[in-house]
Amino acid sequence: MSDQNAVETRTDVVLVGAGIMSATLGAILRQVQPDWSITTFERLDAVAAESSDPWNNAGTGHSALCELNYTPQNADGTVDITKAVNVNEQFQVSRQFWAHGVESGVLTQPKEFINPIPHVSFVHGEANAKYLRARYDALAGHPLFAGMEYIDAPDEFTRRLPLMAKGRDFSDPVALNWTQDGTDVDFGALTKQLLGYVGASGGVVHFGHEVTDLTKQSDGSWVVKVTNRRNGVKKVVRAKFVFVGAGGGALHLLQKSGIEEAKGFGGFPVSGAFLRCTNPELIDQHRAKVYGKAAVGAPPMSVPHLDTRVIGNKPGLLFGPYAGWSPKFLKQGRVTDLPSSVKPDNLLSMLGVGVSELGLVKYLISELAMSEAGRIETLREFVPKALGKDWELITAGQRVQVIRRAKGKGGVLEFGTAVVNAADGTIAGLLGASPGASTAVPAMLDVLQRCFPAQYESWKPKLQEMVPSLGVKLSDDTALFSQVWDWTSKVLQLDTSKVEDASVAV
């Protein structure tokens, strides 16, 4: 079927991709502007089948409680907590939106998507223990990190983390920053609930439909070309606003849109693999998200973690990540993704990163060369008695790190997310990876503020119902923080008192 004969339909909003970002934006728009029509196109046959799938996530529930890359050490030995506070502030916004969703019926059964799990930072060696003590000293007095503990006694370590203690040589000092109030989030389950609400309230979701092109019209609207991957039928959709929440596929579509704001951006794909525990007895001996410290010179994405996941109400355990490399921008993408993303406007950025990120290149080479025995040996830093027969290697989702123009360098690699939008607010997209899904709500509120400045003011009362702290830094208003924390904990059923230590089985 030719494009000329394609069926044409009209909609107010097109969401590209059925992942957590599109689902969040759609759920917000259905509440603040219920008269707008919303159409979602997903190239695969299921919701959240790429990066939002729980086994494809590199990490979940990111709130900077345990991730050491958010708390770098200064030259004088002190620890900078700026990034950690910023990430935690964003996660509090997401928690509030989810709690409001449960209260209002947008979401149901919070246990299906969020569960209390301690977040733990783990190091060994005297110098690293000293750093972790300095990190604790910097964070423990901050209202968003209240309740954090510093643990360096072997007997307490053993009580809380029995799987990690068995066979460990405690003559090498160990230290933990332990936060009881952490969470595990199944973003696949959450995405399904949010998109279920969008569909039930009048939105339309098309699976097996791939957006192939975006063309701006003189009236400011967009012609969106879509192909049904099952039968090859093409259709044309006219939309007043387009959000490209296509994960690794977002860069290509933003490039096709031709907007000036997307020029100069590139993407560097990194695939991830994890060891997933297959022994229920071992899974029952560990209930925590334990994050270590990346090796000197290794990128932030390489931070090792032994991670409890709760998926379908069942506990799971994984360790990683082990980096891999593929030119695909999506797990189910194409090998031409990377080469076809190189354009005249981002060529210098891409080449600049090739020169400036030699450390990343070396890291990837070493990871690709690692044997199965080498992976188990790495795991033994966390689980000294680990045996290969108890673990299986799984491939996680593709992460496409943002490459951005930089004066004098050509381009720099950024380990975060970036909202890209046209100046007229008719199209926006999200690029990048970590912290990703955990900050979906503040990211989508940012999209609304950028793209709908006139409507945003009239939407504010409704948005403040969803997020009571909207526009307020909770760090600066401890009374409000206490109020929303108690509220979200109750509504989301996050009773951490029942999680006495990591040896308690789920």
Swiss-Prot record:
It catalyses: (S)-malate + a quinone = a quinol + oxaloacetate. InterPro entries: FAD/NAD-bd_sf, MQO. Keywords: FAD, Flavoprotein, Oxidoreductase, Tricarboxylic acid cycle. The keyword Flavoprotein applies. It holds the Pfam family Mqo. GO terms for molecular function: 2-hydroxyglutarate dehydrogenase activity; L-malate dehydrogenase (quinone) activity. Pathway: Carbohydrate metabolism; tricarboxylic acid cycle; oxaloacetate from (S)-malate (quinone route): step 1/1. Its EC number is 1.1.5.4. GO terms for biological process: tricarboxylic acid cycle. It is an enzyme of class 1 (oxidoreductase). Its cofactor is FAD. Transmembrane segments: none annotated. Belongs to the MQO family. This is Probable malate:quinone oxidoreductase.
